[in-house]
């Protein structure tokens, strides 16, 4: 599966031709098919947003970031503007303080955490654990496995209640 979106701390972005032109995104890591990125932003005062900024801006709401001309924007229940950020020459308007990620329209909240959160796992979805491209669902993983996964990865995706998605960054000596 090729990644069709970038997971960032501000939300999930669908990859488009103009995405990298509009936003200052740096790729930090991969978790299986998921790209983990960061958007370089500077917070600005909401009162400084001009009408011309609104012609080419993005909205962040409930874990998803969409351009102002997206059909998805109609589904957002936006009642207020919580914060605004500038990235390159584009504005991102945050409409809530929710850090939940909307990943592939799954109806389960996920959050981006450092890999150390793997120690809270009772269920692990592990990509690239033994060989490149493999996938394993592990129930009640051992502490030894959690330790090795935390050393091999920088980030994990978690529901905050014990379900972790992580990349094993397979190498030949991983579980020996």
Swiss-Prot record:
GO cellular component: host cell endosome
Signals that turn on the gene: Expressed in the early phase of the viral replicative cycle.
N-terminal signal peptide: 1-14
Keywords: Host endosome, Host-virus interaction, Inhibition of host adaptive immune response by virus, Inhibition of host MHC class II molecule presentation by virus, Signal, Viral immunoevasion
GO biological process: symbiont-mediated suppression of host antigen processing and presentation of peptide antigen via MHC class II
Source taxon at top rank: Viruses
UniProt cross-references to InterPro entries, sorted A to Z: Chordopox_A35R
Main location: host cell
Location of the protein in the cell: Host endosome
Protein family (similarity comment): Belongs to the orthopoxvirus OPG163 family.
UniProt function note: Mildly affects the expression of MHC class II molecules on the surface of host antigen presenting cells (APCs).
Protein name: Protein OPG163
Gene, per the UniProt record: OPG163
